[in-house]
């Protein structure tokens, strides 16, 4: 539906009590400098879900009158029934802090029905703390630092989230806070502020392309969420033309500990494997994943392939490998190794292929860029087809 300016003026003049859309529950509101003054015509007292897209087409920040008009629209938004809200500016060049007070004001008016919030716009301490105390919040995509608390006054509760995304700039602040909340105690003996979230959280996404290390400290924070089914850690390793070290700092024992803690995983993405081949994890780390993560279907992980043939021979002597035969086979179908180097002569390809199939019998999709990985994938396909 496209409404011309003259029509919008008539709608405003003749607006009935309760507005033109009193029963509207879902609203996608694209705000520009051209339609800002009529955006309130589409607000409803019964809104449950709203997506706000702030479109600013210029390189310079929006002027005060734009922000004032936007604040007026937001203040008119009813939140009594609001359950879900997302707010996204279109222009990366805009200082998003300009919108902090405007959208913090609406968050502070959200009540117990509120369940989902997604926005890169920073929020005030008060607004963040308000979200933390909402009893039914189950989906939260965070793009900024957490609220600041004096050590003696950490929150005694945390929402029972099912899905948490920590975007760019959020991880370094939120991980320490989560560790503090897990270590704190509430009025009930043995219950921490994080107790409900530890049971409820199913999806955790960590998206930080600014050099976050995937190391034992960061993984230890994650391991308390033992019912996770989807864990994605998206970090950046330097490309072949860039200086810097691989950001994947886990070893085989760290992976084994993670696998034992997160046995419900169906998808595990630990960064995007890079070309450096300097990580401490070898193909041996796949064994505890296969043993303990009996529901896993997708895996992306850094592997050091320098001694891959010898590492596989050692796996064959590992008691855990013998244990695999008595366990339900791991349903993993996808293994992503991406830019990981692999240098194998033809005689070793079949050895490695057999070893991988022994660990992941259901593997069908092997994602590696090197020619040896592509050939290895063919060998694995042939082995699987030959056993059927």
Put a short name on every predicted segment.
Residues 1-388:
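Leucine-rich repeat
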């Amino acid at each position: 539906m496209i409404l011309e300016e003259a029509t919008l003026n008539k709608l405003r003049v003749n607006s009935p009590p309760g507005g033109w859309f009193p029963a509207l529950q879902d609203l996608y509101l694209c705000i520009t400098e051209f339609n800002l003054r009529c955006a309130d015509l589409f607000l409803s007292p019964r809104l449950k879900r709203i997506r706000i897209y702030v479109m600013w087409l210029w390189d310079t920040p929006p002027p005060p009158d734009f922000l004032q008009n936007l604040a007026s629209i937001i203040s008119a938004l009813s939140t009594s029934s609001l359950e879900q809200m997302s707010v996204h500016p279109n222009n990366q060049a805009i200082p998003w802090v300009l919108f902090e007070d405007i959208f913090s004001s609406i968050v502070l008016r959200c009540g117990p029905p509120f369940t989902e919030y997604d926005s890169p716009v920073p929020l005030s301490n008060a607004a963040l703390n308000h979200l933390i105390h909402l009893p039914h919040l189950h989906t939260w995509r965070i793009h900024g630092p957490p609220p600041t608390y004096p050590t003696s006054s950490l929150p005694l509760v945390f929402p029972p989230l099912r899905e948490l995304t920590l975007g760019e700039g959020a991880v370094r602040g939120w991980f320490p806070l989560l560790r503090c909340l897990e270590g704190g105690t509430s009025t009930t003996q043995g219950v921490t502020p994080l107790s409900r979230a530890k049971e409820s959280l199913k999806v955790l996404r960590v998206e930080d392309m600014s050099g976050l290390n995937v190391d034992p400290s960061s993984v230890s924070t994650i391991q308390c969420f033992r019912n996770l089914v989807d864990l994605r850690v998206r970090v950046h390793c330097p490309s072949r033309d860039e200086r810097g070290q691989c950001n994947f700092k886990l070893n085989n024992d760290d992976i084994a500990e993670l696998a034992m803690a997160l046995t419900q995983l169906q998808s595990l993405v630990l960064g995007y494997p890079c070309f450096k081949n300097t990580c401490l994890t070898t193909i041996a780390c796949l064994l505890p994943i296969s043993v303990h993560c009996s529901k896993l279907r997708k895996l992306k992980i850094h592997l050091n392939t320098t001694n891959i043939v010898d590492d596989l021979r050692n796996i064959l002597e590992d008691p855990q490998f013998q244990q695999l035969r008595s366990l339900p086979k791991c349903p993993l179908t996808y293994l992503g190794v991406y830019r990981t180097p692999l240098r194998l002569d033809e005689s070793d390809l079949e050895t490695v292929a057999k070893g991988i199939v022994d660990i992941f019998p259901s593997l069908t999709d092997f994602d590696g860029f090197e020619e040896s990985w592509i050939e290895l994938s063919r060998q694995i396909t042939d082995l699987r087809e030959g056993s059927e």
